[in-house]
């Protein structure tokens, strides 16, 4: 009796493991059958049978379980290597669990109680070989870098190339993109690849503007400060402006516009609460510029002089309650002569909109005589939304000078009182680029609402959407336009600020415009005419839109691009074989014909997703080295059209980029979601984010490295370097160091522009989804500054921090 009891106890462990294997096999069998019926891989069905039978044999105490498990593990290893090669993160869901169970089966407590006619050394040996082979595959994968490009820039300058951006002191950062050209290039050289590792915190300032219960989920700290006029100017999500001492971070003055909820109970229902920046205008900068003044208008001339004298240096603040406010940059007091006691009400001639449904999240463009502003329009609410009009005001008086409405593009004469701009015309919510020498403003354009249905779009709205339009600064008339997505059904707004630089080409130096896009193309055109510098090809695109809509037969693609390969079933990922299998089932259940697969009732995969390869963070360039520094991200989304009769039952939407979007007035609402596993992880395999550099003289990628860790986005804070998405921009320096803070983990990082080597990282107290900047303080020290306030949509930690770093003394 005691012998039987001991035998039962000794078989307990293999029996329990057998039950577990059998249950896993049954679960995989159900999913495997589903996947096969969808035309997917046979592996999961066959592996389910093998692992399930191994479990049953273990429960029966049969030694044959080891031999069968060895066969299935060996076959799984061969299959995994055939699918993905030596890619560690791709091998994890395919082999890690089965490898671990194989090791457990080799333990004496699990294998010794087993009996049968098979030789114990043979079955144990076979399993040992299978385990070793799987382990060797995992070990070998540690020495590979799939998706990366290793290279080195072989120059510090291209002969004859200079920085032709608007002049300013080297130590200043006067515009959102440092200059109106949006290049984000600083001529500072104190920080170099040799000393960047010595960067340390210099000071920290807290704005006090922290998201509260009454704020929208998409409350974001996306501000890039300005350093000019001996001060550092910051704006906060609730449109406060704070002037800081650039050396110490101490507050000099603060302006709070006390934004209105626009008759709502609070801000919670708003799509966004964002201020990406303010704009600066200095009369002295134009003092030597010839001006044209009309002797016939002495009153206007006198008013301009009065405004200039009272606010010779001014900041322009777009507020979340739809105002444009002019502030004295020295004191923070409003410039009373601008508009109505310092403010222009941007609601004029716009018509009705929901609270928070229209305002500028981005800084206006400022020229010698004008301040020019666009506006954010909440996506996918209805077909009756505010106009995307661009308005130019006198920089001193706030008088409307011209307006360009893409729904009425020929008439730029200031609109009459009582009239309304074209409803629902394509808008420009991002940042302008300006070339005052050429007399042009460059607009990165969005599209007509809703994003995923275009059956009722007008000819004008189609013409000017999802591309770049160049306007004459003085008149607002169109000089040229280029479209980068035809009949956009995927929310492929041009989100980033266009970048202006002189580019060395085979035909000589040309004034270029670079437009980074969500699709991954970087379009390079002559900014005088819009003609190609880098070839742009029209490629066939998938068809088959829903009834009432259509697709464009072709879509443009630049020869300079960071477009990822099309997804396949084998690209689906998970932590375990089970969530990976479910992702494969999801992939095969959705429509996917490659990039530009149209939205569908079935549900379609959008890849790259509407966060883009490049979003509003854009790119930075080094005009001397003739390179671009990039932070591409790769995340798939899904887009499922829903008949309007079903939309109301689905409840309110979660946000502007997820959940059901009502699209009132259109035949369909739409459900937008990232393509995630049941565990909330991306269904596509990592890496999801990189840093890269492109040689603009030949359009070759010099280097490309995965970037960022999952430390702050996984349940266990382990800094696994998987390459995570980033949202926000970069900047480069003459010292050869580039900076980025927008990754999902809370770090500001420095990189060697020659080879992409990470030189340093500084821990941030909150998410850094913004664009950092650099300047020289009054003490002659180079500082790097970033706002760390988090991003609601990405779920990064919220805060109210401005952090400055410098080299250790």
Model-derived segments and their meaning:
Residues 433, 555-637, 645-646, 659, ...:
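Long, low-complexity segments enriched in small/aliphatic residues
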Residues 197-210, 241-269, 280, 285-291, ...:
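Extracytoplasmic/lumenal domain signature
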Residues 131, 135-170, 192-196, 201, ...:
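N-terminal amphipathic, basic-rich helices that act as targeting or association modules
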Residues 137-188, 552-563, 567-576, 656:
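N-terminal pre-domain segments of enzymes
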Residues 180-186, 209-215, 242, 451-452, ...:
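Short, solvent-exposed loop/turn elements at domain surfaces
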Residues 173-176, 218-238, 269-323, 356-382, ...:
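Repeat-blade elements of multi-bladed beta-propeller folds
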Residues 1-152:
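Topology signature of small-to-medium multi-pass alpha-helical membrane proteins
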Residues 83, 170-212:
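Extracytoplasmic/periplasmic/luminal assembly and interaction segments
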């Amino acid at each position: 009796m005691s012998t039987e009891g001991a035998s039962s106890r000794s078989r307990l462990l293999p029996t329990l493991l057998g039950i577990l294997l059998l249950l896993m096999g049954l679960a995989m069998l159900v999913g495997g059958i589903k996947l096969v019926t969808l035309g997917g891989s046979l592996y999961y069905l066959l592996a389910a049978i093998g692992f399930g039978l191994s479990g049953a044999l273990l429960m029966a105490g049969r030694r044959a379980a080891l031999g069968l498990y060895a066969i299935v593990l060996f076959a799984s290893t061969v299959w995994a290597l055939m699918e993905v090669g030596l890619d560690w993160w791709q091998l994890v869901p395919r082999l890690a669990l089965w490898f671990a169970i194989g090791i457990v089966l080799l333990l004496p407590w699990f294998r010794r109680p087993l009996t049968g006619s098979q030789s114990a050394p043979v079955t144990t040996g076979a399993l040992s070989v299978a385990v070793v082979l799987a382990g060797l595959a995992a070990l070998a994968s540690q020495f590979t870098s799939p998706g990366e490009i290793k290279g080195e820039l072989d120059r510090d300058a291209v002969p004859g190339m200079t920085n032709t951006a608007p002049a300013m002191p080297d130590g200043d950062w006067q515009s959102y993109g440092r200059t109106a050209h949006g290049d984000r290039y600083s001529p500072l050289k104190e920080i170099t690849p040799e000393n960047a590792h010595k960067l340390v915190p210099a000071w920290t300032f807290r704005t006090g503007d922290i998201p509260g219960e009454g704020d929208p989920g998409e409350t974001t700290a996306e501000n890039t400060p300005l350093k000019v006029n001996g001060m550092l100017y910051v704006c906060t999500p609730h449109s406060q402006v704070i002037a800081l001492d650039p050396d110490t971070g101490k507050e000099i003055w603060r302006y709070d516009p006390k934004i209105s909820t626009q008759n709502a109970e609070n801000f919670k229902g708003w799509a966004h609460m964002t201020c990406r920046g303010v704009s600066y205008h200095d009369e002295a900068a134009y003092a030597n510029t010839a001006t044209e003044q009309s002797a016939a208008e002495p009153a206007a001339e006198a008013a301009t002089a009065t405004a200039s004298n009272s606010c010779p240096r001014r900041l322009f603040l777009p507020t979340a309650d739809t105002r444009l406010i002019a502030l004295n940059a020295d004191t923070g007091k409003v410039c009373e002569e601008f508009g109505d006691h310092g403010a222009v009400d941007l609601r004029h001639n716009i018509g009705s909109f929901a609270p928070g449904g229209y305002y500028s999240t981005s800084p206006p463009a400022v020229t010698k005589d004008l301040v020019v502003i666009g506006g954010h329009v909440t996506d996918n609410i209805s077909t009756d939304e505010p106009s995307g009009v661009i308005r130019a005001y006198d920089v001193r008086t706030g008088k409307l000078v011209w307006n360009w409405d893409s729904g009425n593009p020929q008439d730029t004469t200031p609109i009459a009182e009582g009239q309304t701009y074209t409803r629902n015309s394509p808008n420009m919510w991002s940042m302008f680029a300006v070339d005052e020498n050429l007399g042009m403003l460059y607009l990165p354009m969005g599209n007509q609402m809703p994003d995923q249905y275009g059956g009722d779009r007008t000819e004008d709205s189609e013409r000017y959407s999802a591309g770049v339009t160049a306007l004459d600064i003085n008149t607002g008339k169109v000089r040229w336009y280029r479209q980068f997505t035809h009949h956009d059904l995927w929310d492929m707004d041009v989100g980033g600020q266009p970048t202006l630089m002189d580019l060395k080409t085979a035909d000589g130096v040309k004034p270029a415009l670079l437009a980074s896009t969500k699709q991954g193309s970087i379009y390079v055109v002559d900014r005088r005419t819009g003609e190609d510098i880098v070839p742009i090809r029209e490629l066939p695109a998938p068809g088959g839109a829903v009834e009432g809509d259509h697709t464009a037969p072709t879509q443009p693609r630049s020869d300079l691009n960071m477009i990822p390969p099309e997804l396949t079933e084998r690209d689906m990922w998970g932590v375990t074989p089970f969530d990976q299998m479910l992702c494969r089932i999801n992939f095969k259940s959705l429509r996917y014909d490659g990039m530009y697969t149209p939205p569908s009732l079935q549900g379609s995969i959008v890849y790259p997703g509407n966060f883009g390869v490049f979003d509003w963070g854009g790119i930075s360039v080094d005009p001397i080295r003739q390179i671009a520094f990039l932070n591409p991200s790769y995340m798939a989304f899904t887009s499922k059209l829903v008949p309007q009769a079903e939309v109301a039952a689905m409840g309110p939407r979660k946000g502007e980029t997820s959940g059901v979007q009502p699209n009132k007035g259109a035949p369909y609402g739409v459900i937008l979601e990232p393509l995630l596993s049941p565990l909330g992880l991306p269904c596509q395999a990592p890496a999801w984010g990189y840093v890269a550099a492109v040689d603009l003289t030949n359009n070759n990628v010099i280097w490309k490295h995965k970037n960022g860790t999952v430390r702050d986005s996984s349940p266990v804070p382990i800094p696994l370097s998987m390459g995570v998405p980033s949202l926000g921009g970069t900047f480069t320096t003459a010292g050869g160091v580039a900076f980025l803070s927008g990754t999902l983990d809370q770090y500001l990082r420095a990189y060697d522009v020659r080879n992409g080597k990470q030189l340093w990282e500084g821990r941030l107290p909150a998410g850094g989804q913004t664009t950092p900047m650099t300047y020289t303080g009054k003490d002659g020290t180079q500082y790097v500054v970033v706002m760390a306030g988090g991003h609601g949509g990405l779920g990064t930690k919220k805060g109210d921090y401005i952090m400055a770093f410098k080299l250790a003394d």
